[in-house]
Regions:
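Hydrophobic alpha-helical signal/anchor motif
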Residues: 1-3, 24
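Select subsegments of transmembrane alpha-helices in polytopic membrane proteins
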Residues: 50-57, 109-116, 174-182, 234-238
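Short juxtamembrane and helix-loop transition motifs at transmembrane-helix boundaries
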Residues: 69-75, 100, 104, 135-144, ...
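Multi-pass membrane catalytic core of lipid/isoprenoid biosynthesis enzymes
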Residues: 52-54, 96-158, 188
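Topogenic membrane-insertion module of multi-pass membrane proteins
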Residues: 48-88, 272, 287
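N-terminal periplasmic "start-of-domain" segments of outer-membrane beta-barrel proteins
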Residues: 10, 15-46
Length: 287
């Protein structure tokens, strides 16, 4: 990363001085690629736009890790949900204000890896999977494996998402979004603790869900993205009513509603895919 002084004329567009040296204004940052020798100039405004919600989500993910290590699993689960809410706001605000930048995309992806890749895996491991050692040496390693499958799935999902920006159908996600996968694991922890269930009793379900969420994230199963709802223009009354109803249901019993809701969303992809395949196979040849 290179930060330079303004040129003599103060022109932001001028990159070379009279001696042919590359110069960067103080309010801009240059990212230099050692492999290609290319230089990408990023304005401070782009960094500020990306920092707000993404940094908040990153902090929430970090808080989830720290509180889980202290044994405060409900707080850790809530922190993951807060990270998800901030991440959703970040993307929505960027699309509404047309302030999406390359720096913002990369920074958001790194924050997502912490909040929805590492944090949920560590929370579910600390809460339930580490107790699998009581079942024997092999089972303890399977607990490690389940947590790693989830983490690797999140990393691959985020990398694939970055490479498909601009070419993928915005109506659908390819693979389960990492915030939704994280919400399923966080919901399991919060729901179980709220109902007096110990992690040592939930190790089997916890390991299965962790591995399943990791696999769904890297699958080709399509999930509806809800990006067609444009809040910049007129929003249908039914859409607003649905949002209000969702908030009402969540306030009734947050851990139960959030866990069941995100679990249904995670299962909706495979179910819809199987239904479509069945309909396709049942069609007569030539149609």
């Amino acid at each position: 990363v290179v930060v330079g002084d303004p040129d003599r004329q103060g022109h932001r567009h001028q990159r070379l001085d009279s001696s042919g040296q590359f110069r960067i204004p103080v309010n801009e940052v240059a990212v230099v690629s050692g492999a290609s020798g290319g230089v990408a100039v990023i304005d401070d405004a782009e960094i500020e736009d990306a920092e707000a919600e993404a940094t908040g989500a990153l902090f929430a993910g970090f808080a989830a890790v720290v509180t889980a290590m202290d044994g405060n699993f409900v707080t850790a689960a809530i922190a993951i949900y807060i990270a998800g809410a901030l991440d959703g706001m970040d993307g929505r605000v960027a699309r509404m204000t047309s302030t999406e930048s390359e720096f913002g995309k990369q920074y958001d992806s790194l924050a997502d890896m912490v909040s929805f890749g590492l944090a949920p895996a560590l929370v579910i491991f600390q809460w339930a999977l580490r107790s699998m050692i009581e079942q024997g040496w092999i089972w303890s390693k399977l607990g490690w494996l389940a947590a790693f499958v989830y983490t690797a799935g999140a990393a691959l999902r985020l990398a694939r998402f970055n490479t498909q920006i601009g070419i993928a159908d915005k109506r659908y996600f390819q693979g389960l979004p990492s915030p939704s996968a994280a919400a399923v694991l966080a919901g399991l922890v919060w729901f179980s603790v709220d109902h007096g269930l110990e992690g040592s009793e939930m190790w089997l379900l916890g390991s299965l869900l962790a591995a399943a969420m990791g696999i769904l994230m890297v699958s080709n199963v399509r999930y509806y993205s809800f990006k067609e709802i444009d809040f910049k223009n007129r929003v249908p009354f039914m859409a607003l009513l649905l949002v209000v109803l969702i908030y009402v249901f969540v306030t009734i019993d947050p851990p139960k509603v959030l866990f069941i809701g995100f679990l249904i969303y995670a299962l909706s992809g495979p179910v819809i895919t199987l239904v479509r395949l069945r309909k396709k196979r049942s069609r007569p040849a030539g149609e």
